[in-house]
Amino acid sequence: MRSKRPLISMSQVQLVYKSMFCQNVISAVWCEPPAWLALNARAADDEADSTEDPVYHRPVLQPEVLRLLKPKSGSLIVDATCGGGGHTEALLESGADVLALDQDPDAVQHVTERLAYFGRRVIVRQANFRHAGCVLDELGIRTVGGILLDLGVSSRQLENAARGFSFVRNGPLDMRMDPTTSLTAATIVNQYSEEQLTQLFRELGEEPAARRIASLIVKMRRTSPFRETLPLARAIEKLIGRHGRQHPATQVFQALRMEVNDELGALEQGLRVLVARLAPGARIAVISFHSLEDRIVKNFFRDHGREWLDKPEWPAPQRNPDYDLKLVTPKPMEPSDDEQRANPRSRSAKLRVAEKIK
């Protein structure tokens, strides 16, 4: 058993809190999602494309994360998207202490129970990582020894019909990672204009048939608003048809999920907040699954990894005020062929790592 050296006082490491703080953006209160009768319309292959862990997806690129993040015994690592706790557990087993964050109360409950045997070495909080600064301030922590962001959606979220992420199991058209927020997929589908839906499906979903799908949705909702996942998925399938293994609603559902949870906005803000708390010599590792996410990470690391800035109209190069990172992975790392075969959901994963230099 690893050392269980106290990280901070016991009053700071309680897993259930009675207070709300940082303007109610952080909560450790567990809420059971409402029950929903799932109607399995197709094989889970449509969505999972593989046999998955029945609770949470297997952590992607785990050996690479440990090798490149270099967690030190006794240092504090922030697992900013702990999900099912796979990466969190590996970091704890390496000897590091972990602050585990997730905006999903289901994940918080699961990780709290799964990792309870690590005692004081793990702190679990419900919070979007864009608010990590509030959590660290509340705990009295100024800097951390490493950061991990795994931006993938979990199998449990996809497979729980009541959460509304699935296009093969009927449920409310919800898609909120944090059920205390107000915007749902139903609101978007039923209230966004045709032009807004087209832009959303094209930009976040990278859907070639974005305009046709948006037009169909607007036409259909005039007579009957969309309230459940399967009617929407079936309407898209009827319009587009099936080509290959991927369900034709995949990219539209992805776009809706990203919009509901402001995933790109959270990533842009979260990177700034988290890197500001990284100790010199410590590293941040980000696993992304979407080209837009990877572009944000790539550009952030590039902009913070340039010591000098230069423009043709300048008389001389100027120091970059944001220079505080060194690239560890000039090109993103991807899962091995073996990992992709064992876990097809890892296929689009990209890992980028940078080190704080000051």
Outline where the language-model segments fall.
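S-adenosyl-L-methionine-dependent methyltransferase catalytic core, i.e., the SAM/SAH-binding region
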Residues: 2-5, 12-17, 21-358
